[in-house]
Curated annotation (Swiss-Prot):
Native organism: Nitrosococcus oceani (strain ATCC 19707 / BCRC 17464 / JCM 30415 / NCIMB 11848 / C-107)
Family to which this protein belongs: Belongs to the universal ribosomal protein uS12 family.
Function according to Swiss-Prot or TrEMBL: With S4 and S5 plays an important role in translational accuracy. Interacts with and stabilizes bases of the 16S rRNA that are involved in tRNA selection in the A site and with the mRNA backbone. Located at the interface of the 30S and 50S subunits, it traverses the body of the 30S subunit contacting proteins on the other side and probably holding the rRNA structure together. The combined cluster of proteins S8, S12 and S17 appears to hold together the shoulder and platform of the 30S subunit.
SUPFAM superfamilies on file: Nucleic acid-binding proteins
Coiled coil: none
Name of the protein described by the UniProt record: Small ribosomal subunit protein uS12
GO MF entries: rRNA binding; structural constituent of ribosome; tRNA binding
Residues modified as 3-methylthioaspartic acid: D89
Biased composition, class Basic residues, residue ranges: 113-124
The keyword Metal-binding is annotated on this UniProt entry: no
Length: 124
C-alpha cells in the first residue's frame, strides 16, 4: 500500500482498457474491399464451413470478417461495410460484414430478424 506522500509525488495511473475492435478506430463501422473470400472450419466441438472474407479497410488495415446469413454475393474487389462483433468459434475473426449495404446483398427469403440481414419486408 502506498503512503499518502508517495501518492502526492506520483499519483496512481488508470489502466487503459484494450479495445476488442482496434481496426474500427472508435468508429461504428468502416468500409473496405474484399481481398479474399473463403470458408474456414470452426473450433471444436463445432463443425461447419463458415464463410469469411479478408478485408483491406480504408485506414489501410487488413482484417478477417464474418459473412452472416445463408448465401452471399461477395467476391474479390467487393466493397463492404464492417462492424464489430466477434465469432466465438472462429479464432481471429472479430468483425462482421453488414448485410444489405454497399456491394453486399441482403439475405433473400428472410422472414424473422430481417434487420440484421438487410432483408426487405415480404409482400402480403
Amino acid at each position: 500500500m502506498a503512503t499518502i506522500n508517495q501518492l502526492v509525488r506520483k499519483p496512481r495511473v488508470r489502466q487503459k482498457q484494450k479495445s476488442n475492435v482496434p481496426a474500427l478506430q472508435a468508429c461504428p463501422q468502416k468500409r473496405g474491399v474484399c481481398t479474399r473470400v473463403y470458408t474456414t472450419t470452426p473450433k471444436k466441438p463445432n463443425s461447419a464451413m463458415r464463410k469469411v472474407a479478408r478485408i483491406r479497410l480504408t485506414n489501410g488495415m487488413e482484417v478477417t470478417s464474418y459473412i452472416g446469413g445463408e448465401g452471399h454475393n461477395l467476391q474479390e474487389h467487393s466493397v463492404v461495410l464492417i462492424r464489430g462483433g466477434r465469432v466465438k468459434d472462429l479464432p481471429g475473426v472479430r468483425y462482421h460484414i453488414v448485410r444489405g449495404s454497399l456491394d453486399t446483398a441482403g439475405v433473400g427469403d428472410r422472414r424473422q430478424g430481417r434487420s440484421k440481414y438487410g432483408a426487405k419486408r415480404p409482400k402480403g
